[in-house]
């Protein structure tokens, strides 16, 4: 792309998620491209998108030998009945489709970030992979109000920070998955997260106790009036004195 905004040219055209950096002098870029189930292949590209050097192309054979399997990226429908939302599903180690598995949701509602991104090395992947190793099905979901989508999607919980990520969307997605996959026991669902995820986990079990049977809230910011007020005001507007974010 030229400095005046003209001449925009796409140099990659595939289904991968790309993370590219270029040196100050330009001329080439280092591109790391992956999906949720394909590790990042790192290459040096020239200005036309042609591969100059392949730096690394890791595989998953060693992980699979330990019982690991990649998460499935899925699409579901939000609680409004029309908005598409996305998530990741980890099958338990030793998966048997004839069994029924309890579900653990690992939540991080943002709203400054998203939880179930499209790349291989997304934030907090280690936790649900550990739950899968222990015999649980694990999910991560990005409901309305999380980042990385349209402005309208992100603004869903603006001024309503307590509902960042739209917990009702998470419930709708898990129930939809339960209909899609009978081996998911949606009568036994737990939830956990840290920081904003800890807040969301506690709120989930208090607000929807009929659905979430147990919650583990780690380092939750349960009073955003005293936790990084500057951060909270980005997504809630200016906090009044003694304001409480439900």
Regions found by a protein language model. Give the residues of each.
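The serine-hydrolase catalytic nucleophile loop
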Residues: 100-101, 109-128, 143
């Amino acid at each position: 792309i030229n400095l005046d905004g003209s001449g925009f040219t796409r140099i990659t055209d595939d289904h991968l998620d790309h993370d590219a950096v270029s040196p100050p002098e330009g001329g080439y870029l280092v591109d790391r491209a992956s999906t949720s189930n394909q590790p990042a292949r790192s290459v040096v590209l020239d200005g036309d998108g042609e591969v100059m050097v392949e730096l690394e192309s890791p595989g998953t054979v060693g992980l699979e030998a330990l019982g690991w399997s990649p998460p499935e990226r899925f699409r579901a429908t939000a609680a409004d009945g029309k908005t598409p939302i996305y998530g990741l599903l980890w099958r338990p180690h030793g998966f048997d489709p004839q069994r029924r598995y309890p579900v653990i949701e690992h939540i991080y509602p943002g709203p400054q970030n998203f939880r179930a991104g499209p790349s291989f090395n997304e934030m907090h992947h280690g936790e649900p992979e550990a739950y899968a190793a222990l015999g649980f099905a694990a999910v991560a979901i990005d409901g309305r109000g999380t980042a990385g989508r349209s402005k309208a999607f992100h603004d869903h919980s603006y001024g309503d920070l307590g509902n960042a990520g739209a917990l009702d969307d998470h419930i709708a997605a898990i129930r939809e998955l339960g209909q899609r996959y009978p081996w998911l026991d949606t009568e036994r669902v737990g939830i956990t997260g840290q920081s904003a995820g800890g807040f969301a986990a506690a709120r989930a079990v208090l607000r929807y106790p009929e659905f979430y049977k147990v919650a583990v809230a780690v380092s939750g910011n349960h009073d955003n009036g005293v936790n990084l007020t500057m951060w909270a005001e980005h997504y809630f507007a200016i906090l009044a004195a003694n304001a409480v974010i439900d």
